From Swiss-Prot:
Species of origin: Xenopus laevis (African clawed frog)
Upper lineage: Eukaryota, Metazoa, Chordata, Craniata, Vertebrata
Name under which the protein is recorded: NADH-ubiquinone oxidoreductase chain 1
Listed GO biological process terms: aerobic respiration; mitochondrial electron transport, NADH to ubiquinone; mitochondrial respiratory chain complex I assembly
Topological category with respect to the lipid bilayer: Multi-pass membrane protein
Keyword tRNA processing: no
Subcellular compartments: Mitochondrion inner membrane
Transmembrane region(s): 8-28, 75-95, 105-125, 151-171, 177-197, 234-254, 258-278, 298-318
Length: 323
């Protein structure tokens, strides 16, 4: 009985801090955008607006969940629930001091779950029975699938550099030197691709207000809309945490778990702030430019980098030992 309770409580204790971080990320985003546009941002609810995310959450969840009469009711409700479930599950194998799951193929697990998120977007757009929602969903799916190719190839390069699929191997590899130093072109492409993968500005074509109102979640209101929003921001935090681990900024304090956690929090926060900075600074890309960027620029470069990382160790096999 105690084991069952532990298996229920552990994931809950893991998810609550993530959801709290997501809530306050929305507040930080509004504050950052406010100050960059020479205004205050939220500053009424609580001291300097600190309780604003809680007020927003309560407001959304007590609203009546309006569903279009012509929509596919079951799929309409499953899509946001599945989106949040996937966004939470993807955090499980992270190499925290006391992680929830230690997977041998942790990187492939992340890649597989991030690919599954496409189905929630497609399901929500199709089940809404709205032209705008469907067009937004198709755009999002095409964009996500396109950039996943680049992300997969960059991950392959990192795996070959580190020599393993586990997060612990990647962390140990970076004890002496961050991988951003030998792999800075991949770091730049990874960061831009994560912006596109999470549908953030300047790649937020899925919610182009001028043509699509709000994109794939146009028919959602109240609780289901809040679930989509939580999933989106959880994925942003996840991608930045992954950038910290794999991309190139990881470091291992295996004997000092507190330092590991603090290091992860600080670096992920800085990378998330850059996401917000990019949103405040850049206009939205045109859709054809978005696709040209990945298929005509990023894909050839990442393929060349992959071939380089495969061929270099093979070509060095004949050299005598340097030790």
């Amino acid at each position: 009985m105690l084991t069952i309770i532990t298996h229920l409580i552990n994931p809950l204790l893991y998810m609550i801090p993530i959801l709290l971080a997501v809530a306050f990320l929305t507040l930080i985003e509004r504050k950052v955008l406010g100050y960059m546009q020479h205004r205050k941002g939220p500053n009424i609810v609580g001291p300097t607006g600190l309780i604003q995310p809680i007020a927003d959450g309560v407001k959304l969840f007590i609203k009546e969940p309006v569903r279009p009469s012509t929509s596919s009711q079951t799929m309409f409700l499953i899509a946001p629930t599945m989106a949040l479930a996937l966004a939470m599950s993807i955090w499980a194998p992270l190499p925290m001091p006391f992680s929830l799951a230690d997977l041998n193929l942790g990187i492939l697990f992340i890649l597989a779950l991030s690919s599954l998120a496409v189905y929630t977007i497609l399901g929500s757009g199709w089940s809404s029975n709205s032209k705008y929602a469907l067009i937004g969903a198709l755009r999002a799916v095409a964009q996500t699938i396109s950039y996943e190719v680049t992300l997969g190839l960059i991950l392959l390069c990192m795996i070959m550099l580190a020599g393993g699929f586990t997060y612990t191997t990647l962390m140990t590899t970076q004890e002496q030197m961050w991988l951003i130093i030998p792999g800075w072109p991949m770091a730049a492409m990874w960061y831009i691709s994560t912006l596109a993968e999470t549908n953030r500005a300047p790649f937020d074509l899925t919610e182009g207000e001028s043509e699509l109102v709000s994109g794939f979640n146009v028919e959602y209101a109240g609780g289901p809309f809040a679930l989509f929003s939580l999933a989106e921001y959880a994925n942003i935090l996840m991608m930045n945490t992954l950038s910290y681990l794999i991309l190139f900024l990881g470091s291992s304090f295996m004997n000092q778990p507190e330092l590991t956690t603090i290091s992860l929090m600080i670096k992920s926060s800085i990378l998330s702030m850059i996401f917000l900075w990019v949103r405040a600074s850049y206009p939205r890309f045109r859709y054809d430019q978005l696709m040209h960027l990945v298929w005509k620029n990023f894909l050839p470069i990442t393929l060349a980098m992959t071939l380089w990382h495969i061929s270099l160790p093979i070509s060095m096999l004949g050299l005598p030992s340097q030790t």
